[in-house]
Amino acid sequence: MNSLFLINESFTNGYISSVLDIISILAIFCGISVIVNKNPIISVLFLIGLFASVSSYLILLGLSFIGLAYLIVYIGAISILFLFILMLINIRISELQSNTNNSIPLTIILGISLSYSLFQLLPYDIAILSNFSSNINNNLYNLSMNKQNNGNFGINTTPAVSLQPKNNDLLFVTSKIWDGNLAESNHITTIGNVMYSNYSIWLFLASFILLLAMVGSIVIIMKSNASWGGALPNTRETKTEGR
């Protein structure tokens, strides 16, 4: 990433950073339990715990809108819908006792590939709080101010401001791309600008896929109702013939 800046971490809302590590470990445990458990109802319950841990992690980071969206959409709608459907379906005991160890290698491969792709994009946290890091802070700040003062022929006329953190605050790296804008503006404004400007095509594709899923489910239900309606008279005729 280009144009990296070191700024003070102020998004934990007063919480200790170790709480975020505990929530991350809890999310990993819930994700593994979703795959390992043979009972689908228990898997859905662990899935609800996974979504709850992710939403709490986002809320503690300061991304309150995204965390509440996770809480409302995934837990309040999708997970409860899965649980309701599984409670309505008559699950056989033989299916619950089936071996699911074949999916573990696929899960490991998908997890490694996803982690590798995320580590290439996400910035790393910096916990080195020394004079060297404070010097880097000041140098990067001066470079950014030099870029802004183009009318002064690249000469920085503002005094250098010491950005050395107080009370051993955590530092992190951000950039000028859209993920760093979440910390600088309103969350809803940033998400709207990103979705309807840079990723508008993907938004249209997602809405088209959802429309196809809705139409497909309606067609399947209509076909099943038609087949059931044609089968009912035959069963009645067989009953009358038997009498």
Curated annotation (Swiss-Prot):
Concerning InterPro entries, the annotation shows:
NADH_UbQ/plastoQ_OxRdtase_su6, Nuo/plastoQ_OxRdtase_6_NuoJ
State the membrane topology: Multi-pass membrane protein
Q: Look up the domain of life of the source.
A: Eukaryota
Major localization class: mitochondrion
Would I find Iron-sulfur among this entry's keywords?
A: no
Keywords in alphabetical order, please: Electron transport, Membrane, Mitochondrion, NAD, Respiratory chain, Translocase, Transmembrane, Transmembrane helix, Transport, Ubiquinone
> Any stretches that span the bilayer, and where are they?
16-36, 41-61, 69-89, 104-124, 201-221
Q: What is its EC number?
A: 7.1.1.2
Q: Which Gene3D superfamilies match?
A: NADH-ubiquinone/plastoquinone oxidoreductase chain 6, subunit NuoJ (1.20.120.1200)
This enzyme catalyses: a ubiquinone + NADH + 5 H(+)(in) = a ubiquinol + NAD(+) + 4 H(+)(out)
Question: What Gene Ontology terms describe where this protein resides (cellular component)?
Answer: mitochondrial membrane
* UniProt similarity note: Belongs to the complex I subunit 6 family.
Q: Spell out the protein name for this chain.
A: NADH-ubiquinone oxidoreductase chain 6
**Organism expressing this protein natively:** Neurospora crassa (strain ATCC 24698 / 74-OR23-1A / CBS 708.71 / DSM 1257 / FGSC 987)
